[in-house]
Amino acid sequence: MKNRIKLFLVISALSLLFGMKANAQVFDGITQPTKFRVWVPVSIDLHNSKNVGVAPFVGYKQDIGERFSITPVLQYNINKEAFVPQVWLNFNVAKKFYILSRSIYDTKADLYKHTLSATYKLPLGFMVDGTWENMYNGKKFCDGDRLQFVGGWAHRLFVVNAGYSCRAKPGFIANFRWKVTPNDWLQMKYDGGTKSMQLGCALQFN
């Protein structure tokens, strides 16, 4: 537990040392194994290293039977100085196929957004993922939305994913996650569509 706290404090301190101008999107948690998750993402604009976004969040997952769970999430966008409450609804079939629906409300912009994700776990640690980001952008459906498709492989200590994002801001996307413990991890994500890099830390516990 002490190592988890130290890891979280180090990442949080680094986050606050960066400049704070860009937005940060979060697309992790579809297979969250624990009740609590603290996630600290730091997004860096590759064209302007001073353009950095920090938007940490905490979520609590409540299982409703074996196939369904609901996770209230509270996120704070440091750049906008705005709270972003969310509700995540997760449905799974035999712990192999997952669907995650995210309802997101930006309190400062007074906008409701919606994102839909799915993951299918294949044998030998392989997986395929899809995300429909901003399928509803607060004003219209399918306006400025992004479709992302990736394939990946999970090992005991790491997970790698790579794929492509189309429609708005198309480009190659890749993700590398290193498991510090079975439930806690560090992550690096590249998004060729937004020309950004994201570094993050997740702490998960019951």
How would you label these PLM feature ranges?
Residues 51-99:
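Glycine- and aromatic-enriched membrane insertion/assembly motifs of diderm outer-membrane
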Residues 9-17:
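Bacterial N-terminal signal peptides
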